């Protein structure tokens, strides 16, 4: 009897101890990003999940959503609960600020105005470059087909438009001449896809176009995936620096109690491991060590920024991409 009673007491104590053990949290994060970053974050996410597990002991599940950058921003405004956004142009985060989703000081929260990496705009042409495309001026030739995503919905397309505009300004130092130049270029665009990956599909799978204008990382990815025997990459004489801004979606993380994880996720992008993954995916990292390590894969290219050459994103948005702006005028003339 005494033995049975002792056994029951021991079992009860064991149950109490079991109940008292801490339960590790299982949390999900959603990263809403632009079209051609999906391969990057497919590698970043498991690496960060392992890092977080080591640091906190908690299991973290990371999900990702991709599309044209501006369309993705619209989805977040429409109710898609992103814990973080990783875009390719700052207007797509600023519009979240205007809608009360992101704090106005988002640029100050992380280094380099919250841009952990950059890329630039290049040309992808058919193998052997049969149309002898070397620079932006070649894209205005009659009969040439240029594939580019829609600048209204895609940051990739917007950078293409602005890179061409900047090139024309350098040549003529005249706004009217720049408008005429970009009008001729877009007259050669047979279809405007909603995002960068859609434009890639049009060029590589549907066989439409003589040249795809896209981000450097996308061009290199395609060249590698297809064995290097279908396309060549051409670097124009002048291009644009495309900095990739990131931000915590404050309204969502406060609602979901995921701020700590979301902030750590974005900080991880600046870590040595994060910068190495970024460089391996042919984005240009901010880390000097990573840039040096992968120097051979990043040819020197002359670039300008929206801020230095075009007056900043606010001016660009109002002048070029607002309803009735220069881009709309150009498209209407097509």
Where are these regions (language model features)?
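N-terminal export leaders
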Residues: 4-8
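Early extracytoplasmic/lumenal segment of secretory-pathway proteins
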Residues: 25-99, 109-110, 215, 334
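N-terminal signal peptide c-region/cleavage motif recognized by signal peptidases
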Residues: 20-22
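Ligand-binding pocket segment of bilobal, Venus flytrap-like solute-binding proteins
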Residues: 171-237
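Extracellular/periplasmic juxtamembrane helices and adjacent flexible linkers that interface
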Residues: 253-334
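Periplasmic-binding protein-like
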Residues: 115-119, 181-186, 193-194, 226-259, ...
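A conserved helix-loop-strand patch within extracytoplasmic ligand-binding domains
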Residues: 97-170
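Ligand-binding "clamshell"
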Residues: 96-111, 221-235
